[in-house]
Amino acid sequence: MHYPSKNKVRMLLVAASMFLLAAGGLQNANADVKQENAVNAERVQKGKVLFSENCQVCHQEGGAGKPGVAPSLTNKELLSAASDRFLLDTIRDGRPDTAMPTFGQLLKDEEIQAIVSYLRSFGTEPVKGGMLDNDRKAMGDPRLGARWFSQVCAGCHGVNGEGYEGSGSGTAIGKSGFLGKASDGFIRYIIKNGRSNTPMRGFAGPTGMANLNEQEIDDIITYLRVLQK
């Protein structure tokens, strides 16, 4: 009878040990994923309850929004373009001079994060917020931007971007509460793509409402920054 050499036995034992270690590592990884998913699901459910208690009265069930009252918070464009920081800071600080109050003294940080996790659960596209926040600064002519804003934006957002206070159906994009948190990349993305489930439609390309080109969009953003100042 032929017996395997000591080296072969040693190699077989090493291979078996490596297999058992890999299997154990895979089991641990699967357990970690399951635990993380459970934590995330719990956070989303907590956020849903907090949203119902604090946000739903204006933003409606499921964050669908209502024109003239509060914008949709669960449309795919916003959830793709907005960074977590944008959402967290907006909930915490509110939007001064609008109906959006500050929740920073009412809710704990982890509760605000839970609301953001709940909103994120509606997302259907990759989150580009971080990339957009690092996008180039708008370099435009505010005088031309004022003209474009008057022609294509003021009808909904108000003459000076005052939003609902100007009896418009759009939000107050000319006030510091928005402009202080929104990057040029974020604004550019929303102008191009619009926000579904709201009156805001995309303005770029041949199918856009105004077919604005890159420079014209930058002109509008530059004008908004003048309003911010």
What are these regions, as identified by a protein language model?
Residues 47, 51-61, 115, 119, ...:
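The canonical Cys-X-X-Cys-His
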Residues 56, 78, 96, 121-124, ...:
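Residue-level marker of structural boundaries
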Residues 67-74, 90-122, 131-135, 167-172, ...:
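Axial heme c-ligation environment in periplasmic c-type cytochrome domains
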